[in-house]
UniProtKB/Swiss-Prot annotation:
Family annotation (InterPro entries): DNA_gyrase_inhibitor_YacG, Znf_NHR/GATA
Metal-binding among keywords: yes
HAMAP family in the cross-refs: DNA_gyrase_inhibitor_YacG
Cofactor binding description: Binds 1 zinc ion.
Cofactors required: Zn(2+)
Family: Belongs to the DNA gyrase inhibitor YacG family.
Protein's name in the database: DNA gyrase inhibitor YacG
Single Gene Ontology MF annotation: zinc ion binding
Gene behind this protein: yacG
Function: Inhibits all the catalytic activities of DNA gyrase by preventing its interaction with DNA. Acts by binding directly to the C-terminal domain of GyrB, which probably disrupts DNA binding by the gyrase.
Amino acid sequence: MSMSHIYTVVRCPRCGKPVPWNETQRFRPFCSERCRLIDLGSWANEDYAIPGEPIDPAEPSEDRNGAEGPPTD
């Protein structure tokens, strides 16, 4: 067996279908454009969320350097 036929198989995050992890799979890790777009829509609808502390919009934000938001002249 040639080494070029060995590849990893992952599961589509949307439907669970096996997907070969190689250059020929255009929508990897998804099995199809449909599953990719459904997943994108789920993010847009805020069905998914990355855990974190709630943000209070009344408090000024700080950037990585510790500076506060834009000047309020």
